[in-house]
Curated annotation (Swiss-Prot):
The lineage of its organism: Viruses, Monodnaviria, Shotokuvirae, Cressdnaviricota, Repensiviricetes. The active site is at Y107 (for dna cleavage activity). Its cofactor is Mg(2+); Mn(2+). A divalent metal cation binds at E59, H67, H69, D111. Belongs to the geminiviridae Rep protein family. Residues 18-121 form the CRESS-DNA virus Rep endonuclease domain. This is Replication-associated protein A. Homooligomer. Interacts (via LXCXE domain) with host retinoblastoma-related protein 1 (RBR1), and may thereby deregulate the host cell cycle. Part of the C- and V-complexes which are RepA-Rep-DNA complexes involved in the c-sense and v-sense transcription. Divalent metal cations, possibly Mg(2+) or Mn(2+). A motif (RCR-3) lies at residues 107-110. GO terms for biological process: DNA replication; symbiont-mediated perturbation of host cell cycle G1/S transition checkpoint. Coiled coil: none annotated. It is an enzyme of class 3 (hydrolase). Keywords: Activator, Covalent protein-DNA linkage, DNA replication, DNA-binding, Endonuclease, G1/S host cell cycle checkpoint dysregulation by virus, Host cytoplasm, Host nucleus, Host-virus interaction, Hydrolase, Metal-binding, Modulation of host cell cycle by virus, Nuclease, Nucleotide-binding, Nucleotidyltransferase, Repressor, Transferase.
Length: 323
């Protein structure tokens, strides 16, 4: 029973093993065979799978014994269910799939004592090209396709048309994104503005003379400028006081002029033909004096106004005379 059981277990282990890969990594431990002998044997063994490259390297263990590594690359995947398929004489080969052929080849060649090589090595992610055939044309990536479209498209319509013909699936599922990118690459050109009301003659300009209103109302002199123009003014405070006095005097004369004009209009005074305004008339004096002073204040130089010190002396002498 045990024999039958053991034989059944052995058959079960053989049935469970399966190797199917185009790149095979083999290790023969404690194997003194020559690399060339192993390589030629593997080439004949896998002829039906069209071997493209075989590399066999012999190394020494730390105890001085030999062991061999082999990298086998075939055009067709090498398929077997026999775990002793790659055995050579009495030396059993450890079978592994070489998922990264670059790393396997680098590992095999780390410290070779003897090496045998046949065929053309196929780097990772590159298909094998048999001798006499040209490599297949590389298919451009989506990034390369879009870069080509953006470089050559000249309008929004042409851009969307090229995307539709080059990337139909992406155009059908992501059309809103392509429409947005088209609007950014080819924005609408703003039309030049046209005034609905064409320009006409200068009929809306103000005909008032601003200068006549500006001088009596917004005539301003800074204390610094007044101090420079008036030699008798020795300080900034004195200049401010003089300017305030001038402002008060001007306003007082303007008010008297308005009162005199209103009084004359209310009494209905009529000028006699040929008679000029006389200094004997009280109203005439006031109007004449007011107009004269206003013109004088608005046209005379600032240097004609007395400084505060002189004005104070005049005010005191006038008070004594009045007393």
């Amino acid at each position: 029973m045990s024999t039958v059981g053991s034989s059944s277990e052995g058959r079960h282990s053989v049935r469970c093993f399966r190797h199917r890969n185009a790149n095979t990594f083999l290790t023969y431990s404690k194997c003194p065979l020559e690399p060339e002998f192993i390589g030629e044997h593997l080439f004949r063994l896998t002829r039906e799978y069209e071997p493209a490259y075989i590399l066999v390297v012999r190394e020494t263990h730390t105890d001085g014994t030999w062991h061999c590594h082999a990298l086998l690359q075939c055009i067709k995947p090498c398929t077997t269910r026999d775990e002793r398929y790659f055995d050579i004489d009495r030396y059993h080969g450890n079978i592994q799939s070489a998922k990264s052929t670059d790393k396997v080849r680098e590992y095999i060649l780390k410290d070779p004592k003897d090496k045998w090589e046949k065929g053309t090595y196929i780097p990772r992610k590159k298909s094998f090209v048999p001798p006499g055939k040209e490599p297949a044309e590389k298919k451009p990536t989506k990034d390369e396709v879009m870069r080509e479209i953006m470089t050559h498209a000249t309008s929004r319509e042409e851009y969307l048309s090229l995307v539709q013909s080059s990337l139909p699936y992406d155009w059908a599922t992501k059309l809103n994104y392509f429409e947005y990118s088209a609007s950014r690459l080819f924005p609408d050109i703003a039309e030049p503005y046209t005034n609905p009301h064409p320009t006409t003659e200068y009929d809306l300009h103000c005909n008032e003379t601003i200068e006549d209103w500006l001088k009596p109302n917004i005539y301003q002199v800074s204390p610094q400028a007044y101090k420079l123009l008036e030699p008798s003014c020795l300080s900034l405070e004195q200049a401010i006081a003089d300017l305030e006095w001038l402002d008060d005097t001007t306003r007082m004369l303007q008010e008297k002029e308005r009162e005199a004009s209103t009084s004359a209009a209310q009494h209905g005074q009529v000028k006699h033909p040929g008679l000029e305004a006389s200094d004997d008339t009280t109203t005439g004096k006031t109007i004449s004096t007011g107009l004269h002073m206003m013109k004088k204040l608005s046209t005379m130089s600032l240097t004609t106004f007395p400084s505060s010190s002189v004005r104070a002396g005049n005010d005191s002498s006038a008070a004594k005379k009045t007393t």
